Swiss-Prot record:
Binding site for S-adenosyl-L-methionine: G103, F122, S123, K124, L125, T126, F127
Gene name of the record: rlmH
Organism from which the protein derives: Caldicellulosiruptor bescii (strain ATCC BAA-1888 / DSM 6725 / KCTC 15123 / Z-1320) (Anaerocellum thermophilum)
Lineage of the organism: Bacteria, Bacillati, Bacillota, Bacillota incertae sedis, Caldicellulosiruptorales
Record's protein name: Ribosomal RNA large subunit methyltransferase H
GO cellular component: cytoplasm
The protein's role, per its UniProt record: Specifically methylates the pseudouridine at position 1915 (m3Psi1915) in 23S rRNA.
Length: 154
């Protein structure tokens, strides 16, 4: 199973449709669970660290022992699609659930990052949250298409 935990919701219909399309395509190979965490109101907190700690509590209650945790972080390592697919393959073959965590525009707490088995960066560029979720779905689909030998990845 692949679980995607993200802080914030998708508001634009076209981003939502793209995610749903990739979820449908992925369903032939793997079950996908998506968990959206409500973004905290910045105005309620004295500092960002406190806000991130509150979001971390909400995120980590959905993380189970034994899952392979991939935290999406701009300071993580960058992988090729083939390298990414190899990480997916190893964990799928060992029957491990894979959990991806996407933070809010404020990022993620160090507590969440410490739980990661892999800190993964898609780029040094900054992406809108909604678009990034589509990119993540696409790369998961691409990775699995490499594993299962479909013609999607060229």
């Amino acid at each position: 199973m692949i679980k995607i935990i993200s802080v914030g919701t998708i508001k634009e219909k076209y981003f939502l449709q793209a995610c749903e399309e990739y979820k449908k395509r992925l369903s032939r190979w793997v079950k996908v669970e998506e968990i959206e965490i409500k973004e905290e109101d910045e105005n309620k907190y004295f500092n960002i660290e406190t806000l991130l700690e509150k979001e971390a509590d909400k995120i980590l209650k959905h993380v189970k022992e034994g899952e392979f945790i991939i935290v999406c972080d701009i300071n993580g390592i960058e992988l090729s699609s083939e390298e990414f697919s190899e990480i997916l393959r190893k964990n799928i073959n060992s029957s491990k659930n894979i959990t991806f965590i996407i933070g809010s525009s404020n990022g993620l707490s160090n507590e969440v990052k410490r739980r990661a088995d892999l800190l993964l960066s898609f780029s040094k560029l900054t992406f809108p949250h909604q678009l990034f979720r589509v990119l993540l779905y696409e790369q998961i689909y691409r990775g699995l298409s490499i594993i299962y030998g479909t013609k999607y990845h060229k």
